[in-house]
């Protein structure tokens, strides 16, 4: 028997409480966590070099979780005992599933977030490159889904890029919160074994440790903050998807062929299927975040098995977010803008403003004067669409020159963000390299 008991595929209790399916997501991270623990026991003198070597060799051979186990931790320990023998039981010294799963979750989420942040930057670059092509491409803007004022497609694209940049900064800050080590905290109050928690954290590439062992083993608040921000990002992406569906339906843009499908009956149809799926995945993400918060809200402090039911939702939300960023990268790299004739009523605001300035009368007076002409059907503007855009005098407007300068500013910010995430990633890799060096030394 190990922990509670060995189960079987027919054991209803084991099957009911088992987390094996969701644990497959963290196999490599659980192994890495165990390596750090074994090395820590070796460095502090609790484990002999030969025993440590055998365990580390066996760890590298573990590939899959069999059936009949409560979780990956039970499966891994059973595997090690069968491979190494009784000496593998030393891994239980100073270790709990509680601190090990908390560590593995953070390692996995860290890797996923670094990948996602890199992907977001790739999409931002695509948007800025495309914006440079469309600085003078006339495009309508809308409020209440009604025609508002003339803008450019570059103006729309840089709006998306800045939204993504804002989300990027917040998600990067959650990454820093996630990248703290719970390892060495035991089940709840630590352990009598003199484990160097800070050394373990360093070997695993963490920035620091979570000091309080109760918090380290039972808190999921940092992860929930991350999933919350990813869900906000998905909501932002869903709005963009809705825009693209609307623009496509109104013949303002042509979506890439790879992002549309036709009807089984109507051969002329170009259905925006990828954007429809993105909207649905955003809704699912909201539902999964709600499930996570609902599970977590009533738990007493300390580890409870309810926490394992949260794990599957972490990976679903982050995988949905990553795939959605990838789909939008593909779409925007190929999107085409159609030639658009914008109704001249969209120039009414410009005429009212110019009239107020030239006559030196309150804007509300000229507003009503222009509005009356629009209602009567007698409104005619003397402006061209391009004039309307280039008269805009504020930073962030679609004015051609100001937009060209804004794109340069945004490109500089993107390069800074690219450098920041790359340096952060390399710092982690460097620390993990030290763990590998020690493992190699033990294996000699």
Swiss-Prot record:
Kindly give the InterPro entries that the UniProt entry links to this protein.
Argininosuccinate_lyase, Fumarase/histidase_N, Fumarate_lyase_fam, Fumarate_lyase_N, L-Aspartase-like
Name one cellular component (GO) term: cytosol
State its location(s).
Cytoplasm
Q: Its Gene Ontology biological processes? A: arginine biosynthetic process via ornithine; L-arginine biosynthetic process
Instruction: Point out the coiled-coil segments of this chain.
Output: none
What keywords tag this UniProt record?
Answer: Amino-acid biosynthesis, Arginine biosynthesis, Cytoplasm, Lyase
Is this entry keyworded Ribosomal protein? Answer: no
Provide any one GO MF term from the record.
Answer: argininosuccinate lyase activity
Substrates-to-products reaction catalysed: 2-(N(omega)-L-arginino)succinate = fumarate + L-arginine
Q: The organism sits in which domain of life?
A: Archaea
| Gene3D superfamilies linked | Fumarase/aspartase (C-terminal domain), Fumarase/aspartase (Central domain), Fumarase/aspartase (N-terminal domain)
Write down the Pfam families for this protein, in alphabetical order. Answer: Lyase_1
Per the record, the major location class is cytoplasm
Q: Does the keyword Cytoplasm apply?
A: yes
- Pathway named in the protein's UniProt entry: Amino-acid biosynthesis; L-arginine biosynthesis; L-arginine from L-ornithine and carbamoyl phosphate: step 3/3
Entry EC no(s): 4.3.2.1
Q: Identify its protein family.
A: Belongs to the lyase 1 family. Argininosuccinate lyase subfamily.
Question: Can you say what this protein is called?
Answer: Argininosuccinate lyase
């Amino acid at each position: 028997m190990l922990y509670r008991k060995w189960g079987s595929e027919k054991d209803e209790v084991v099957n009911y409480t088992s987390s094996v399916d969701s644990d497959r997501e963290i196999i490599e991270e659980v192994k890495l966590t165990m390596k750090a623990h074994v090395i820590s026991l070796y460095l502090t003198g609790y484990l002999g070099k030969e025993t440590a070597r055998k365990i580390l060799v066996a760890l590298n051979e573990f590939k899959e979780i069999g059936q009949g186990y409560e979780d990956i931790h039970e499966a891994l320990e059973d595997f090690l005992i069968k491979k190494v023998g009784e000496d593998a039981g030393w891994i239980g010294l100073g270790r709990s599933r509680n601190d090990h799963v908390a560590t593995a979750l953070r390692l996995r989420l860290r890797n996923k977030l670094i990948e996602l942040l890199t992907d977001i930057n790739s999409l931002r670059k695509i948007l800025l490159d495309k914006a440079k092509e469309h600085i003078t491409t006339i495009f309508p803007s809308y409020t209440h889904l009604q025609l508002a004022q003339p803008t450019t497609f570059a103006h729309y694209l840089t709006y998306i890029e800045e939204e993504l940049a804002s989300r990027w900064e917040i998600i990067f800050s959650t990454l820093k919160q996630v990248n703290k080590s719970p390892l060495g905290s035991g089940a709840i109050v630590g352990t009598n074994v003199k484990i160097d928690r800070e050394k373990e954290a360093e070997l695993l590439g963490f920035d620091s440790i979570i000091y309080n062992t109760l918090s380290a083993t039972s808190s999921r608040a940092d992860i929930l903050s991350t999933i919350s921000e990813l869900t906000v990002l998905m909501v932002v992406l869903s709005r963009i998807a809705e825009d693209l569906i609307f623009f496509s339906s109104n013949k303002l843009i042509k979506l890439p062929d790879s992002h549309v499908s036709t009807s089984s009956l109507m051969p002329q149809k170009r259905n925006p299927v990828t954007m429809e799926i993105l909207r649905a995945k955003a809704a699912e993400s909201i539902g999964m975040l709600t499930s996570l918060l609902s599970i977590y809200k009533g738990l007493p402090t300390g580890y409870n098995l309810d926490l394992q039911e949260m794990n599957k939702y972490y990976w679903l939300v982050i995988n949905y977010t990553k795939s959605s960023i990838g789909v939008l990268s593909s779409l925007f790299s190929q999107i085409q803008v159609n030639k658009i004739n914008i109704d001249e009523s969209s120039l009414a605001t410009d005429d009212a403003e110019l009239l107020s300035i030239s006559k030196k009368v309150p804007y509300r007076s000229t507003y009503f004067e222009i509005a009356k002409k629009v209602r009567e059907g007698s409104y005619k503007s003397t402006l061209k669409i391009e004039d309307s855009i280039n008269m805009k005098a504020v930073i962030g407007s679609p004015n051609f020159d100001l937009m060209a300068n804004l794109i340069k500013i945004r490109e500089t910010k993107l390069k800074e963000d690219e450098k920041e995430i790359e340096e952060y990633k390399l710092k982690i890799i460097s620390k993990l390299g030290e763990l590998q060096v020690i493992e190699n030394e033990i294996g000699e």
